[in-house]
């Protein structure tokens, strides 16, 4: 048996001689195991069956017809920095296998583990590329990097800096590179470690900026590069939004469904990061020719790198005014002419490339972060008079949605209205309902063309000689209706899934004043009781009913809908989405209907208590109190509502944005309308995508109770701010992307020209 421990696993650096040079046949390894540990296996990337790094270079962009899949320039630099792997000798393989077995046994003490990690990392000196890219040993190396001390980690990074891009572009090596960056991020809480970490990062960035195109266009390398950008910024390395994923918050903002705007566009930065290093790295990534940038725009992986870089520079307008012109391949701000300008020929190129999948994603992000002057220039020079043409394109329609959502003023809203509103029917028929939803949302946000938008949507769904009573069912089943050949014979589709975007459009519609949406209100309240019940059971349709109950529609109209749900509240409460509708109905109805709801929930109390949402709903509606003492329960309900009505009267309900209702008792049903109680679950109720689950547990706690980790986050933030609160040296202002780094001061953003 082999004895394994810190003493039996010393560093074997004395055995490393000239064989450490990077020579030998690429791809060979002595670790030809017949069977590999399933727990150590990594998933293949889609479309990538082998281990060859070159296979990851393939451009998988959607591709505009005028864009070449790869430029001649790229084919030249694509193979400039190829490394060949040397075989791993059996003794080295055995050494790391013993370490893996030792760590798996969980018999190593913390101090001994640190010594083993240090010795093993020292063993990789001069052979970092071979060991990091070995499919088996790379797993062990990841464990070592995650468990070593900071000085050992930084030493490994500095030693491997010259081959770091090659490691990052390898299928196995990319995981090692990411582990190294993640491990560095864990030490950022220690202010004393910043200088050491910055030195290690500088050694990596210096090599990357010498030839960034290879790494940007590689499927593995681009992912590592995005993590490196996040680390330099000081943000979480695992934020999905920074890796191209569209979050529910982004969709909520786009469709104007978000209640609070306080946290819009706020990027959580737990650490101060390395602003000088970020500037240096971005300068190197963007210092390429116009021809190279044309390729980077449409390459799947480099586009993601550019998107991450733009999101990290959010609200830094001065820097964005330098970065975005470089990405769009137009000249930076002309000093002789005030403001930012896009030439006509460049605007045409941007417009033609917009139909490319990767470039369309990139332009979406540009529109999200663009300063007002740049947005206005793009709107007038690129998009104006081409909105409908782009709206019906498979990729460009998402760009138009982003453009509409970030409209600055009513004048722009008017231009978009003139080009798109007359074509609402065409957009819906071609499945581009997202463009319609975005225009309706921005109309409500800018308070412009509200009535016209509502009327245009009615005209798109119902012909002139048709009754408007069918507007709601057709929007609920938008795809079924427009997919029907003979629309005059279309009927309600029982049991079918309701259209998510159609329901989102209706949620936006019910945010308008009731004066603009009477056809929609009439259509909803005129639906058959079984249709109303089916809508409430659907996860998307339930949100439409909730939006209607939260609107400023008349009290009698809301009551008419709630009455049609009578007899089904118990059944609805057993559904996760339906339980929210039950709660909304309870808040919006009179005492008689509240009793009916409580009675129905009491009948299903046993089954309801077993569901995820049941305990909260039973407690919120006080079903136990109703069961034991119904008279006292009724008195409490009246007292609660009366107290709230007095509060609204005293503090000016006319200025409130909340909807009104007067369902206190039977005697007060026809009185003046009052404001609906603000729902403590507003974030859940206004969740933008109906396919997502809504959870009650986190809302059942006291509102004043801080979220887990909130106190700790604030303490860390204060500590960091105190550590970085130093007087800034006065000096001349330099361009953001102006060249090379000057020194290693992390507080400096200046670069040599």
Swiss-Prot record:
List, in alphabetical order, the Gene Ontology terms for molecular function in this entry: RNA binding
- Per the record, which residues fall in region Disordered? 1-84, 677-753
Q: Per the record, where are the segments of Basic residues compositional bias? A: 744-753
The PUM-HD domain extends over 322-675
Q: Name one GO biological process term.
A: response to sucrose
Query: Which terms are listed as keywords in the entry?
Result: Nucleus, Repeat, RNA-binding, Translation regulation
GO CC aspect terms: nucleolus
Q: Where are the Pumilio repeats?
A: 123-158, 159-198, 206-244, 284-325, 345-380, 381-418, 526-563, 564-599
For whether the record's keyword set contains Thylakoid, the answer is no
InterPro entries hit by this protein: ARM-like, ARM-type_fold, NOP9, Pumilio_RNA-bd_rpt
* Primary residence: nucleus
> Which residue windows does the record flag with biased composition (Basic and acidic residues)?
23-38, 47-57, 73-84, 677-688, 699-712, 719-728
Gene3D superfamilies documented for this protein: Leucine-rich Repeat Variant
Concerning PANTHER family, the annotation shows: NUCLEOLAR PROTEIN 9 (PTHR13102:SF0)
Question: How does the record comment on the protein's domains?
Answer: The pumilio repeats mediate the association with RNA by packing together to form a right-handed superhelix that approximates a half donut. The number as well as the specific sequence of the repeats determine the specificity for target mRNAs.
> What is its biological role?
Sequence-specific RNA-binding protein that regulates translation and mRNA stability by binding the 3'-UTR of target mRNAs.
Q: What is this protein called?
A: Pumilio homolog 23
What is the protein's species of origin? Arabidopsis thaliana (Mouse-ear cress)
């Amino acid at each position: 048996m082999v004895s394994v421990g810190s003493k039996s696993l010393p560093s074997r650096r004395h055995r490393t001689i000239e064989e450490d040079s990077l020579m030998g046949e690429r791809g060979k390894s002595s670790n030809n195991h017949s069977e590999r540990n399933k727990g150590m296996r990594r998933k293949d990337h889609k479309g990538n069956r082998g281990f060859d790094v070159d296979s990851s270079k393939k451009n998988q962009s959607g591709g505009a017809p005028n864009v070449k899949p790869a430029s001649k320039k790229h084919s030249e630099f694509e193979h400039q920095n190829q490394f060949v792997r040397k075989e791993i000798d059996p003794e080295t393989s055995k050494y790391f296998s013993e370490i893996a077995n030792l760590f798996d046994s969980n018999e190593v003490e913390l101090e001994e583990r640190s010594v083993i990690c240090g010795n093993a990392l020292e063993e990789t000196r001069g052979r970092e590329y071979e060991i990091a890219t070995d499919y088996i040993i790379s797993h062990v190396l990841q464990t070592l990097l995650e468990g070593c001390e900071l000085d050992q980690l930084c030493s490994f990074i500095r030693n491997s800096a010259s081959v770091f891009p090659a490691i990052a572009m390898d299928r196995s090596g990319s995981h090692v590179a990411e582990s190294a960056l993640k491990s560095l991020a864990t030490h950022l809480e220690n202010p004393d470690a910043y200088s050491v970490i910055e030195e290690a990062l500088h050694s990596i960035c210096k090599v990357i900026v010498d030839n960034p195109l290879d790494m940007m266009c590689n499927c593995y390398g681009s992912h590592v590069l995005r993590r490196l950008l996040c680390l330099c910024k000081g943000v979480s390395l695992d934020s999905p939004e920074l890796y191209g994923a569209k979050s529910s918050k982004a969709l909520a903002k786009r469709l104007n469904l978000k209640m609070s705007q306080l946290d819009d566009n706020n990027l959580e930065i737990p650490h101060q990061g390395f602003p000088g290093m970020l500037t240096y790295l971005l300068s190197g990534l963007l210092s390429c020719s116009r021809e190279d940038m044309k390729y980077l725009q449409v390459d799947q992986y480099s586009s993601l790198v550019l998107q991450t870089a733009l999101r990290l520079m959010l609200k830094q307008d001065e820097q964005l005014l330098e970065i975005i012109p470089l990405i769009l391949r137009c000249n930076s701000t002309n000093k002789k002419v005030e403001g930012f300008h896009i030439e006509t020929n460049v605007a045409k190129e941007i417009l033609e490339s917009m139909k490319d999948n990767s470039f369309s994603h990139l332009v979406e992000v540009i529109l999200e972060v663009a300063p007002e002057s740049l947005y206005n220039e793009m709107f007038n020079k690129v998009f104006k008079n081409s909105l409908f043409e782009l709206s019906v394109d498979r990729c460009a329609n998402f760009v138009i949605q982003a453009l509409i959502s970030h409209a600055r003023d009513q004048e722009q809203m008017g231009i978009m209205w003139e080009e798109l509103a007359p074509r609402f029917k065409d957009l819906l028929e071609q499945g581009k309902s997202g463009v319609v939803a975005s225009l309706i949302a921005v109309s409500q946000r800018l308070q412009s063309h509200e009535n016209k938008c509502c009327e245009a949507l009615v005209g798109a769904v119902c012909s002139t000689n048709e009754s408007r009573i069918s507007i709601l069912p057709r929007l609920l089943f938008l795809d079924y209706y427009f997919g029907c050949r003979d629309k005059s014979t279309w009927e309600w589709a029982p049991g079918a899934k309701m259209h998510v975007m159609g329901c989102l459009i209706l949620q936006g519609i019910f945010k308008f004043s009731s004066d603009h949406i009477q056809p929609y209100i009439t259509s909803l309240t005129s639906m058959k009781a079984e249709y109303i019940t089916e809508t409430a059971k659907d996860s998307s349709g339930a949100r439409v009913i909730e939006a209607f109950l939260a609107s400023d529609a008349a009290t009698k109209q809301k009551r008419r809908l709630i009455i049609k749900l009578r007899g089904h509240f118990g059944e609805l409460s057993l559904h996760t989405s339906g339980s929210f509708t039950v709660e909304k109905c309870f808040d919006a109805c009179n005492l008689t209907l509240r009793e009916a709801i409580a009675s129905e929930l009491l009948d299903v109390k046993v089954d309801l208590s077993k569901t995820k949402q049941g305990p909260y709903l039973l407690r919120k509606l006080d079903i136990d109190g109703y069961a034991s003492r119904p008279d006292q329960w009724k008195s409490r309900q009246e007292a609660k509502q009366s107290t709230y009505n007095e509060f609204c009267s005293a503090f000016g309900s006319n200025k409130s944005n909340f909807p009104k209702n007067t369902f206190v008792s039977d005697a007060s049903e026809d009185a003046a309308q009052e404001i609906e109680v603000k729902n403590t679950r507003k974030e859940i109720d206004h969740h933008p995508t109906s396919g997502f689950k809504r959870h009650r547990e986190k809302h059942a706690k006291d509102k004043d109770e801080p979220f887990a980790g909130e106190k700790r986050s604030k303490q860390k933030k204060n500590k960091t701010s105190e550590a970085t609160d130093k007087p800034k040296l006065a000096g001349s202002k330099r361009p953001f992307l102006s060249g090379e780094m000057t020194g290693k001061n992390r507080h400096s953003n200046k670069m040599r020209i």
